[in-house]
Amino acid sequence: YADAIFTNSYRKVLGQLSARKLLQDIMSRQQGERNQEQGARVRL
């Protein structure tokens, strides 16, 4: 019983961690695109 609770919460934590990493990846990717756009505008 305790083992099931542990694996359940462990899976939940892993899901939160991977979701957070996914969000960070998306955010940094958007930030990079935004920086490239600003650089292109400066060149123009």
Curated annotation (Swiss-Prot):
List localization entries: Secreted
UniProt keyword terms in alphabetical order? Amidation, Secreted
Q: Which Gene Ontology cellular-component terms appear in the entry? A: extracellular region
Primary place of residence? secreted
Listed Pfam families: Hormone_2
Concerning InterPro entries, the annotation shows: Glucagon_GIP_secretin_VIP, VIP/GHRH-like
Leucine amide modification sites? L44
UniProt GO BP: regulation of protein localization
GO MF? neuropeptide hormone activity
Against PROSITE patterns, the record matches this protein to:
GLUCAGON
Give the note. Answer: The carboxyl-amidated somatoliberin is twice as active as that having a free carboxyl end.
Q: Which family does the entry's similarity section mention?
A: Belongs to the glucagon family.
What is this protein's function per UniProt?
A: GRF is released by the hypothalamus and acts on the adenohypophyse to stimulate the secretion of growth hormone.
Q: What is this protein called?
A: Somatoliberin
Q: What is the primary gene name for this protein?
A: GHRH
